[in-house]
From Swiss-Prot:
Gene3D superfamilies: Ribosomal protein S20. Binds directly to 16S ribosomal RNA. SUPFAM superfamilies: Ribosomal protein S20. Disulfide bonds: none annotated. This is Small ribosomal subunit protein bS20. The keyword rRNA-binding applies. Residues 1-25, 69-89 are annotated as: Disordered.
């Protein structure tokens, strides 16, 4: 454990940020999984809503630095491709 006051504060702050980041990432992954489950069921209406939510979560994570902006873009592209495939059929 740190002895210096500023190091103690940094350790506390770091732990809080870690917990917050973990919950944000978890929410992002959950939104993606919900979307993919709806794609499996071929529920176009709900899948469109879930796609919007998942896209927002990905954008938010990218803007906060949780994931790289190109990684978010790639994920959104793949989700959009899945959505388009069920809309076409």
């Amino acid at each position: 454990m740190a002895n210096i006051k500023s190091a103690i504060k940094r350790a506390k702050t770091s732990e809080k940020r870690r917990a917050h980041n973990a919950s944000m990432k978890s929410a992002m992954r959950t939104a993606i999984k919900k979307f993919e489950a709806l794609v499996e069921l071929k529920d176009v209406e709900k899948a469109q809503e879930a796609f919007i939510i998942a896209s927002k979560k990905l954008d938010k994570a990218a803007s906060k630095g949780l994931i790289h902006k190109n990684a978010a873009s790639r994920q959104k592209s793949r989700l959009a491709k899945k959505l388009n495939s069920i809309q076409a059929s």
